[in-house]
Structure formats: C-alpha cells, structure tokens
C-alpha cells in the first residue's frame, strides 16, 4: 500500500476518546487490572485506569493520560499512518504514548493536551467521538 493512501484513512477515519484517565507505570510484575501489560527483558510496564491503581506497588508512574482509540481497521500493509498521526500531533505540541494491538491502535495524550489532539486529528479529516 502506498504512503499516499493514508489520506483516505484519515478522511474516512474514526477515533474514540475514552472517558477514563490512565497511568503508565513501571512495575516488577503484571498488574491484575491493567488495560495493557508490556514486558521486555528490562522492565514491565502497565497501562491502567488511574481509578484502578489502588494499592498497586510501582517503581515509576506517569499519570493523567487519556486514550484515543482508532476505531478503524488498519491493515499491516498500510505505510505511514502513525507517521502522519504522530507528525501532526508533534507539530501541534502534543506528546504521545502509543500501543498497537493486532486489530486496534491507541494513542495516549496528556489530559491538558486532549482538546488540541482532538482538533489536530479532526484537521486530518477524522471524526472523533468522546465517551
């Protein structure tokens, strides 16, 4: 698939903003209530709703993130989708944390930058729905 085809994905794209606020934490082991757990040979990272943190022990925390989920099928052959999204958000001064699963992609943005992120994605042609 050509990189230029991403314009079609932006124009027909849909994204959903979660109502929850998330924390990204570094832990020694997986969190039971986590949205996502990423393990590599150096660390374990959990993405978890802040309301579910409870007495969770962690080695580091970065909170106040909101999740934007791209509610669309993005084929593995698609080139440049995240480059376009991350580039536009970077140009708008929005830092991101991303997670991709087999069929769904998510971008986490700081709460105070959420409105800027939504407007930026809308300028790309996406329709955004807030939960």
Locate the predicted segments by residue.
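Short acidic/polar capping segments at secondary-structure boundaries
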Residues: 29, 103-104, 113-114
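A generic structural motif
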Residues: 43-48, 104-110
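A short glycine-rich beta-strand->turn/loop micro-motif centered on a GG-aromatic cluster
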Residues: 95-103
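Regulatory modules associated with amino-acid/nitrogen control
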Residues: 1-95, 116-131
